[in-house]
Amino acid sequence: MGACLQQVGGGALFFCRGEWFFRFTMMENPDKETKQELAMTEIVKMRDVRFDPGLFVNFSSGTVLDNLLCSYQGLPKGVNYMIIGDPGVGKTTIILDLIANIERQNAGTRILFISAEMNEIDLAVYVQRYPMFGNLNIMFVESDFDGHRHHLQEIEEVLQQGWDIVAIDSFYELQGIVKEEEDITMRLAETKLLALIKRHNKAINDTHTNTTFLTIQQVTKSGAFIGSNRLKHMITAMMELRLDNPKNIYSDRYIVFSKHRRGDVGVKLYYNLSSTGDVTFDEQRYRQELQLRNLQSNVSTQLRDFASQFERLFNNEIEQ
């Protein structure tokens, strides 16, 4: 087991082999034997693990995007989806549209948007164009140049209330704010944020809610994801927003997953931001791409079958 990095209520968070673990224990400095004893309690059989059935009931947005979010449709609970994309492709708009639709489709769902990149004036422009964004709960996080505020503590207190979905724009900017305010390294700031996210994934909050995080992340000039391997490994899915022609901001835009533990990768869903009031998705084009993928898969299967049959016939001829 890795070293204890943070005490949480009646237990502690541990980091080991790229994963976070929570263990209930009041021991602050257990000896070697106790650590080994406690580590053994982490070994389980999944058939013995029990979950609330509601954990596997997804949040529906009422759009075709639900098909990409999960193989059994909708946004799952207690997961981490990271969103990256080319500048100006509409990452914030897509996420705000998604959570606004989920809130509209699922009465009583508690959703929070943490904005570390835009202030109230910036978001007012979004609300004018997409009025339904005005109903969202938003927490603005801005750098405190006076050094009196500690946004990490404020975020911890707010998240402790228990939220179904938390969207962050962006992780890198929030990480930088935490670094400056707490006077720590970027790596430690990342560690603290990851520990916080993992804790709420596992429903360690006042309402025992398995929180889903939608985290927008910045990219390099080449479009590559910014972040450590720890951050990359703990995410459930990587949603990419891309342009057909990266050099032309007016070219067609699409959503595609490059990593997905809950659904398919490589399936494109084209979208349009030109309409006022809502994001529009090209469902017909999406269905056509699915048909083409299925056709390619069937052809590949047939070719493998023919190759296997030929190999068996060839081997039989040699034996005879």
Give, region by region, the residue ranges found by the protein language model.
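N-terminal pre-Walker A segment at the start of P-loop NTPase domains
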Residues: 41-69
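Phosphate-binding/switch region of NTP-binding enzymes
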Residues: 84, 201-301
